[in-house]
């Protein structure tokens, strides 16, 4: 089946094309071509690659860790509403048996498919952290790194485990990083008190970047650059960024752009309160409170976010001054490259999957097509 989507402006990796159309065949972009002069209708103001959210714990009142049959479908529809065409359900620190169960459910969803945004695999955030910058993760459940245990996680996930987060100062971390990379698993560094030197050693071992840059890690000091300094200055490192203006000050967001504009991966780190009213929710098994859209633990620490990807894109434009094209790439092309799926996702290009979002001039989501099919909200 072939159909055409026409836009006043269409975003490619190279930039905007005015008055162009996508020709889509069997869920794949077959061609990008000028709209015939005789055709005046447009399907969208802006056609862009659908967003990829690589770090999602929950939303719409549900959590990835919930053992219920419709949780991932509900979350996938929630993500599609914010312009996300594909995503990684993300686990949290919990008993190993609970993590295994979540990874199995995610693997099953990958295999069977379903409504909404496509599930690309899983992201393991915890239990391989250290206590100093634990965030909302319960330190009593932190575990040591063992190759056999990592292999078991990969096996339980039926090889759908895409990302493992860990603290690079843990014993055995460098060996674990090398092993995970051999298994084609990405490694992100976070919830850690690592030094600049320890972080650089982890990048040398193959680690891919930082978990929500600035949050849950050693900050930048002029005599001890810490994890943030290592990430900002190492061109090998992808930098996850929660661009809600609460987790990271706009000036620090701008600094990230100055140092690493081509390496920023916009994430939501969203938890079950995303898209919901203020009130009490749970994260990592603990009660948290959302007020004014900001979620905090009982001790006052930030506990995940309620951010949407489309809002993150708008925030980057408004708060840091990057162009709309640059911000959109941070939420599409960059995460695709980080995951190694940029051959099929992340930009509008012939041969890639037709994962497409229509935006208005204010970068608000109007419609989304996932593998060429219009998603209904």
UniProtKB/Swiss-Prot annotation:
EC number: 3.5.1.-
Reported induction: Induced by growth on N-acetyl-D-galactosamine but not by growth on N-acetyl-D-glucosamine.
InterPro entries, per database record: Amidohydro-rel, GlcNAc_6-P_deAcase, HutF-like_N, Metal-dep_hydrolase_composite, Metal_Hydrolase
Binding site for substrate: 136-137, 215-216, 223, 244-247, 302-304
Domain of life: Bacteria
One record GO biological process: N-acetylglucosamine catabolic process
Gene disruption: observed consequences: AgaA deletion mutant, but not agaA-nagA double mutant, can grow on N-acetyl-D-galactosamine. AgaA deletion mutant is probably able to grow on N-acetyl-D-galactosamine because NagA can substitute for the absence of AgaA. Deletion of agaA does not affect N-acetyl-D-glucosamine utilization.
Cofactor: binding comment: Binds 1 divalent metal cation per subunit.
Entries under Pfam families matching the protein: Amidohydro_1, HutF_N
Disulphide connectivity of cysteines: none
Record keywords, A-Z: Carbohydrate metabolism, Hydrolase, Metal-binding
Active site: 269 (proton donor/acceptor)
Protein residues bound to a divalent metal cation: 125, 191, 212
Listed NCBIfam families: nagA (TIGR00221)
Protein purpose: Catalyzes the deacetylation of N-acetyl-D-galactosamine 6-phosphate to D-galactosamine 6-phosphate. Can probably also catalyze the deacetylation of N-acetyl-D-glucosamine 6-phosphate to D-glucosamine 6-phosphate.
Record's miscellaneous remark: NagA and AgaA can substitute for each other and function in both the N-acetyl-D-glucosamine and N-acetyl-D-galactosamine pathways.
Name listed for the protein in its UniProt record: N-acetylgalactosamine-6-phosphate deacetylase
UniProt source species: Escherichia coli O157:H7
Record lineage: Bacteria, Pseudomonadati, Pseudomonadota, Gammaproteobacteria, Enterobacterales
């Amino acid at each position: 089946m072939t159909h055409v989507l026409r836009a006043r402006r269409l975003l490619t990796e190279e930039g905007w094309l005015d008055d162009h159309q996508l020709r889509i065949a069997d869920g794949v972009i077959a061609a990008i071509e000028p709209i015939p002069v005789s055709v005046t209708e447009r399907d969208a103001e802006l056609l862009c690659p659908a967003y990829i959210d690589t770090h999602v714990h929950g939303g719409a009142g549900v959590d990835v860790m919930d053992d219920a049959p419709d949780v991932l479908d509900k979350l996938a529809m929630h993500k599609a509403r914010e312009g996300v065409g594909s995503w990684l359900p993300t686990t949290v620190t919990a008993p190993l048996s609970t993590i295994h169960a979540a990874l199995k459910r995610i693997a099953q969803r990958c295999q069977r498919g379903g409504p909404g945004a496509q599930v690309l695999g899983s992201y393991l955030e915890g239990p391989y952290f250290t206590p100093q910058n634990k965030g909302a993760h319960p330190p009593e459940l932190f575990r040591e790194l063992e190759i056999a245990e990592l292999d078991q996680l990969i096996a339980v996930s039926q090889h759908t485990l895409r990302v493992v987060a860990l603290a690079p100062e843990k014993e055995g971390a460098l060996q674990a990083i090398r092993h995970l990379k051999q298994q084609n698993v990405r490694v992100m560094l976070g919830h850690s008190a690592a030094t600049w030197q320890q972080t650089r050693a982890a990048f040398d071992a193959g680690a891919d970047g930082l978990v929500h840059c600035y949050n849950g890690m050693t900050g930048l000091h002029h005599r001890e650059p810490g994890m943030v300094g290592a990430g900002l200055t190492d061109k090998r490192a992808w930098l996850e960024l929660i661009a809600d203006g609460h987790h990271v000050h706009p000036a620090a967001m701008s600094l990230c752009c100055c140092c690493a504009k081509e390496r920023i991966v916009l994430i939501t780190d969203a938890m079950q309160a995303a898209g919901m009213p203020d009130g009490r929710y749970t994260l990592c098994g603990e009660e948290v409170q959302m007020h004014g859209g900001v979620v905090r633990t009982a001790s006052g620490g930030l506990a995940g976010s309620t951010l949407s990807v489309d809002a993150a894109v708008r925030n980057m434009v408004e708060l840091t001054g990057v162009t709309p094209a640059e911000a959109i790439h941070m939420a599409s092309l960059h995460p695709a490259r980080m995951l190694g799926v940029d051959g099929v996702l992340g930009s509008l290009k012939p041969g890639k999957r037709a994962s497409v979002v229509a935006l208005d001039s204010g970068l608000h989501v109007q419609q989304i097509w996932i593998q060429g099919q219009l998603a209904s909200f």
